[in-house]
Design a protein with these regions (language model features):
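Short loop/turn and low-complexity linker motifs enriched in small/turn-promoting residues
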Residues: 19-56, 65-188
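Sec-dependent bacterial lipoprotein signal peptides
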Residues: 1-17
Length: 188
């Protein structure tokens, strides 16, 4: 019985992970309504709206038009493991953070596992490992664990049982939302 339960748990986890591959976040960070056509399927995107697209690995065609039908951009992009369609050429930052099971190991681990530097946003300085993404890039391949619509968790369950008592996770943020999340997470 124990083995069959473990088998189903592992199978469920594998299916969940497999379903996650190819997820592409389509986000209109702009103030104007746009139409985004991906592989001949049109998505009506209100300002500051987001949709999750299930795209297979491979090359895809995109056409972005305004309300009047004027083509703003036409291009192709390659999906390998998912990512973000940056249709409004917005600024994004990936924050890499360390989770640990024991608080006394925190500072030593941070020094050895992260490359922390200061980042300034609107005159405020934030210290951490940040990667500013190229805002001119139409498709940004996922190098993060948590997307725009997901929370950066305050803690990870099960680290005390893991062989390594720490884990590194990454989340993509809109530049303006990083400050708010930073203040919440550094207090943990």
């Amino acid at each position: 019985m124990k083995y069959s339960l473990n088998f189903y748990l592992i199978l469920s986890l594998m299916l969940f992970v497999a379903c996650e591959e190819g997820n592409v976040e389509l986000y209109n960070a702009g103030d104007d309504f746009i139409y985004v056509t991906v592989d001949e399927l049109r998505h009506d995107m209100a300002p500051h709206s987001m949709k999750l697209l299930e795209l297979k690995k491979g090359r895809h065609k995109i056409v972005i038009t305004d309300r009047e039908g004027k083509t703003l951009e036409e291009d192709t992009f390659e999906v390998n493991k998912g990512g973000l369609l940056n249709v409004s050429k917005h600024s994004y930052i990936v924050w890499t953070d360390l989770y640990w099971a024991s608080s006394e190991e925190n500072s030593k681990l941070r020094e050895t596992k992260l490359q922390e530097e200061a980042l300034e946003i609107d005159g405020q300085e934030y210290v951490g490992e940040f990667q500013e993404l190229d805002e001119e890039q139409l498709f940004i391949e996922s190098e993060w664990d948590y997307g725009l619509g997901e929370e950066f968790p305050a803690s990870l369950w099960g680290l005390e049982f893991a062989q390594e008592k720490w884990s590194i996770k990454r989340k993509i943020f809109r530049k303006k939302e990083l400050a708010e999340a930073y203040m919440k997470l550094v207090k943990r």
